[in-house]
Amino acid sequence: MKIADKTVTRAILERHGFTFKKLFGQNFLTDTNILQKIVDTAEIDKTVNVIEIGPGIGALTEFLAENAAEVMAFEIDDRLVPILADTLRDFDNIKVVNEDILKSDLQTRIKEFANPDLPIKVVANLPYYITTPILMHLIESKIPFAEFVVMMQKEVADRISAQPSTKAYGSLSIAVQYYMTAKIAFIVPRTVFVPAPNVDSAILKMTRREQPLVQVQDEDFFFCVGKAAFVHRRKTLWNNLTSHFGKSEEVKVKLEQALEAADIKPSIRGEELTITDFARLADALREVDLK
């Protein structure tokens, strides 16, 4: 029987006297069909290494290790390390790392794979409270992860994969889609977790683009403009930009010049702009010395 079988999960938790900590946003998946779908979605086979974040008691880790060349699982809760040593004892291709993924030296860690030259995929059931920081940390790192298949709160998955002129579209959509393609693979109901979270989850598949979606003069400034445009969603782009850059006559003249050069109407809302529009706008703002 698999670790994710509900009776097995309960027995493991009881045997080790484990209690859930809200601090770590722990929800363990107890549906083997969904775990298999995650592995299938990620297309895991012996030609790839996997980094897993938040293995819990090893339910997903077990499925990954059966299919991948090697799995490196990052677990922040040191109480789970001996449990993982127990539940995954039959595998010789799993390395459990008791570290916070945000603080880990990943460049050094990935050299510890038996074959570090294999493509690396990230597969994870991310804690809701820290999904975005972890994703952006990994995406912006210099490590060429081939793909991310990540379980997260459905609302966050909607925001990441959203298209312009939709309610969910915003600065997070821009930040991720600049580097990756993003598509929701399937929905995971809250009922298949122990304990059950308050919301449904989604599996989001993100594949790294060979080149960023658009070319910009300054990436940091491009992301900054994207954030500024959504500070007040219901306000116009002009209102958000003057709130960010200032309302002096000099600034307003420069903003008008930049918007005209980028062929963007001041009365438009941020959610109506494509990522290509934002790239033109950011470069035009730099040209008039608004940074």
From Swiss-Prot:
Kindly name one Pfam family recorded for this protein: RrnaAD
Q: Where, in this chain's numbering, is S-adenosyl-L-methionine bound? A: N27, L29, G54, E75, D100, N125
Q: Which InterPro entries match?
A: KsgA/Erm, rRNA_Ade_diMease-like_C, rRNA_Ade_Mease_Trfase_CS, rRNA_Ade_methylase_Trfase_N, rRNA_adenine_dimethylase, SAM-dependent_MTases_sf
- Localization annotation: Cytoplasm
Q: What is its EC number?
A: 2.1.1.182
Any GO molecular function = 16S rRNA (adenine(1518)-N(6)/adenine(1519)-N(6))-dimethyltransferase activity
Q: What SMART domains does the record tag this protein with?
A: rADc
Q: What keyword terms does UniProt attach to this protein?
A: Cytoplasm, Methyltransferase, RNA-binding, rRNA processing, S-adenosyl-L-methionine, Transferase
Q: Does the keyword Methyltransferase apply?
A: yes
**What chemistry does it catalyse, as a reaction equation?**
adenosine(1518)/adenosine(1519) in 16S rRNA + 4 S-adenosyl-L-methionine = N(6)-dimethyladenosine(1518)/N(6)-dimethyladenosine(1519) in 16S rRNA + 4 S-adenosyl-L-homocysteine + 4 H(+)
- CC per GO annotation: cytosol
- Its EC top class is transferase
What top-level branch of life does the organism fall under? Answer: Bacteria
User: HAMAP family, from UniProt?
Assistant: 16SrRNA_methyltr_A
Function description: Specifically dimethylates two adjacent adenosines (A1518 and A1519) in the loop of a conserved hairpin near the 3'-end of 16S rRNA in the 30S particle. May play a critical role in biogenesis of 30S subunits.
Family, per the entry?
Belongs to the class I-like SAM-binding methyltransferase superfamily. rRNA adenine N(6)-methyltransferase family. RsmA subfamily.
The protein's name in its UniProt record? Ribosomal RNA small subunit methyltransferase A
In which organism is this protein found?
Answer: Streptococcus mutans serotype c (strain ATCC 700610 / UA159)
